[in-house]
Amino acid sequence: MGLRLSFMGTPHFSVPILHALLDAGHDIVAVYSQPPRPAGRRGLKMIPSPVQNAAQAKSIPVFTPQTLKTAEKQAQFAELAVDVAIVVAYGLFLPKAILETPRLGCFNAHASLLPRWRGAAPIQRAIMAGDKETGMMIMKMDEGLDTGSIALSRSIPITDNTTADELSNKLSHIGAELMIEMLSTLEKGQLKLTPQSGENITYASKIKKEETRIDWTKPAEFIHRQIRALSPFPGCWCNMNIAGREERVKILGSRLTKGPSREIGWIEPNSLIIHCGQGRIEITSLQKSGGKILDSAAFLRGARLSTVF
């Protein structure tokens, strides 16, 4: 017999864990997700989150409050009488009253090796920092920012070409496996929790808009990490001189290349090899504003480039 759960999550990253819990036979009596967001040019269409769509496809009741800080919303949550709340990239603050309501507690799946990269963007920050490994951790939540005691963890390597999208997909599925294992152990009364270390704490703040623009005076290795960390969303960008006209282009894929250096921003003829402040980088995937995502060969067939800036 499975546990009575509530699930709290918002992006695509959370969906495999929701599906895994259902497949394991747990009774998810309610799903919480952030409210639908406006989309389209005029913002007239409201788009539900991936988690809301997934829950509704399984006929699970969905709640999308703007906040959980009010007595009304906390009472509504208490009425669910859940054993455990599972939290995966929900994005809303859980006050003490919510944390203390489930019979066995609130458990969070976090995509880093805590206490490194506490906060909102652990996958992106790990890649941008050049970390060689990261992982997934299941922790019992407390009132701090990702400070809870650890129930389970698993580490994986970050290669020199791993993108945030690839890493997110891997960690999400690892998180699903760990969450099922954790709940099984918890249900048997055998779960052991380990407090986090007080050393080597770092914070993964949200990605700022200014961090998405490529500065070609930076080393090629730095730019390569930046592109990988922000691919596919929000994506890095730069301006390109295409047939004498300045155009904004989103850069979604790259690789480091060796060779002699030239002035910063120089593009090798018939290629997308760009010279940086130190070293060179080859752009492998990019997208003009309003256009399709293209590989470098397809892009070059329709563009005459001179410089980037």
UniProtKB/Swiss-Prot annotation:
Stored Pfam families: Formyl_trans_C (PF02911), Formyl_trans_N (PF00551)
Keywords for the protein's UniProt record, in alphabetical order: Protein biosynthesis, Transferase
Function field: Attaches a formyl group to the free amino group of methionyl-tRNA(fMet). The formyl group appears to play a dual role in the initiator identity of N-formylmethionyl-tRNA by promoting its recognition by IF2 and preventing the misappropriation of this tRNA by the elongation apparatus.
EC number(s) recorded for this UniProt protein: 2.1.2.9
The protein's name in its UniProt record: Methionyl-tRNA formyltransferase
Keyword Hydrolase found: no
Binding positions for (6S)-5,6,7,8-tetrahydrofolate per the UniProt entry: 112-115
InterPro entries: Fmt, Formyl_trans_C, Formyl_transf_N, Formyl_transf_N_sf, Formyl_transferase-like_C_sf, GART_AS, Met-tRNA-FMT_C, Met-tRNA-FMT_N
Source superkingdom: Bacteria
Catalysed conversion reaction: L-methionyl-tRNA(fMet) + (6R)-10-formyltetrahydrofolate = N-formyl-L-methionyl-tRNA(fMet) + (6S)-5,6,7,8-tetrahydrofolate + H(+)
Transferase keyword on record: yes
GO MF assignments: methionyl-tRNA formyltransferase activity
GO cellular component, one term: cytosol
Family membership: Belongs to the Fmt family.
Matching Gene3D superfamilies: 3.40.50.12230
UniProt xrefs under NCBIfam families: fmt
Gene coding for it: fmt
